[in-house]
C-alpha cells in the first residue's frame, strides 16, 4: 500500500477502499467534492462555504474549516467568534476618498464593482454576479494587478498562484 505525503498542506493520506482520503490537521474536515469557497475571516462579510458566489466547474478536493470556524491570516482555522471584526470605512461613516487609497498599485474608483472580486481566484473561477450590490466608491487595483484576498495589497497578476505555470508569466 502506497501513501502520498502532502507537505504543502501539512496533511497526510491513507488508502481506503482503493481511494485516497485526505486527513486534515487542526480544525479542518475533508470533503471529497467541496465548493470553491471556504470560511475565511477576512471574507466572511462577502462569502463563506454556504454562500459562495463562485460557480463550481469541478470538485475541489481540499481541507475546509469545520462549521463554526474560519481561516485567520495565517491559514489556521479558528472559531468564527475569534475572527477580527472587519469594518469598512463606509460602515463607520468615514468617507472613502483618494487619500485612502495608499496601497501600492491601487487607485480610487468612484464606481468600484464587488463582483467578480478583484482577487486572484477570479482568474480561474466563474462568479454569479446577478445579485451583487451596485458599484460604490472604493480602492481598486491598477490594470494588471489583483489581490490574493479581499484585504491584501494589489500584486502583479503573474504573482497570483493561479498563474504559476502560465506561459504568459514566464
From Swiss-Prot:
GO terms for biological process: anatomical structure morphogenesis; extracellular matrix organization; wound healing. Induction: During humoral immune response. By lipopolysaccharide (LPS). Induced by A.niger alpha-1,3-glucan. GO terms for cellular component: extracellular space. Keywords: Disulfide bond, Glycoprotein, Metalloenzyme inhibitor, Metalloprotease inhibitor, Protease inhibitor, Signal. Cleaved. It holds the Pfam family TIL. The keyword Amino-acid biosynthesis does not apply. Glycans are attached at residues 48, 149. GO terms for molecular function: metalloendopeptidase inhibitor activity. Residues 1-19 form the signal peptide. The keyword Glycoprotein applies. It comes from the Eukaryota. The record marks 88-89 as: Cleavage. Gene3D superfamilies: Laminin. PANTHER family: ACCESSORY GLAND PROTEIN ACP62F-RELATED, RIDDLE. Inhibits thermolysin, bacillolysin and pseudolysin, B.polymyxa metalloprotease and human MMP1 and MMP3. No activity on trypsin or cysteine protease papain. This is Inducible metalloproteinase inhibitor protein. It comes from Galleria mellonella. The lineage of its organism: Eukaryota, Metazoa, Ecdysozoa, Arthropoda, Hexapoda.
Amino acid at each position: 500500500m502506497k501513501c502520498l505525503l502532502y507537505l504543502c498542506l501539512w496533511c497526510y493520506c491513507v488508502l481506503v477502499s482503493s481511494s485516497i482520503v485526505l486527513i486534515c490537521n487542526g480544525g479542518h474536515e475533508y470533503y471529497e467534492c467541496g465548493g470553491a469557497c471556504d470560511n475565511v475571516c477576512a471574507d466572511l462579510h462577502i462569502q463563506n462555504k454556504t454562500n459562495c458566489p463562485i460557480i463550481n466547474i469541478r470538485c475541489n478536493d481540499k481541507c475546509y474549516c469545520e462549521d463554526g470556524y474560519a481561516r485567520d491570516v495565517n491559514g489556521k482555522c479558528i472559531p468564527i467568534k475569534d475572527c477580527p471584526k472587519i469594518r469598512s470605512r463606509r460602515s463607520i461613516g468615514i468617507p472613502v476618498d483618494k487619500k485612502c487609497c495608499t496601497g501600492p498599485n491601487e487607485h480610487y474608483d468612484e464606481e468600484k464593482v464587488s463582483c467578480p472580486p478583484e482577487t486572484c481566484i477570479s482568474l480561474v473561477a466563474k462568479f454569479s454576479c446577478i445579485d451583487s450590490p451596485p458599484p460604490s466608491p472604493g480602492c481598486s487595483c491598477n490594470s494588471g494587478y489583483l489581490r490574493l484576498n479581499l484585504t491584501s495589497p494589489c500584486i502583479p497578476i503573474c504573482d497570483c498562484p493561479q498563474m504559476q505555470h502560465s506561459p504568459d508569466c514566464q
